[in-house]
Amino acid sequence: MKEGIHPNYREVVFQDMSSDFSFITRSTIQTKDKIVKDGKEYPLAKIEVSSESHPFYTGTQKIMDTAGRVEKFRQKFGNKLGKAAK
């Protein structure tokens, strides 16, 4: 293998922003944030969904609208879809 062409494969902390669950795994992801975990500094990758918050794994159903997309859609279209479907 050629030297210097492969990304840095290192330990990274992935943190689920909706449940504050985090785990350490190896990845080549480029991050700007860092976090101290177990007395060691790691790069931090923030994710919106993990096995701790995904409805398939938790068995619960919840609306995960972190960007306000559902509310924006409802303001724009209101109940027009409900009337058209009848």
Curated annotation (Swiss-Prot):
GO CC annotations on file: ribonucleoprotein complex; ribosome
Keywords tagged on the record: Ribonucleoprotein, Ribosomal protein
Keyword check for Zinc: no
Entry annotated with the keyword Nucleotidyltransferase: no
GO terms (BP aspect): translation
Pfam families: Ribosomal_L31
SUPFAM superfamilies hit by this protein: L28p-like
Coiled-coil positions: none
GO MF annotation: an example: structural constituent of ribosome
Subunit structure: Part of the 50S ribosomal subunit.
NCBIfam families per UniProt: L31, PRK01678.1
Family (UniProt): Belongs to the bacterial ribosomal protein bL31 family. Type B subfamily.
Protein name, as recorded: Large ribosomal subunit protein bL31B
Protein species of origin: Cupriavidus necator (strain ATCC 17699 / DSM 428 / KCTC 22496 / NCIMB 10442 / H16 / Stanier 337)
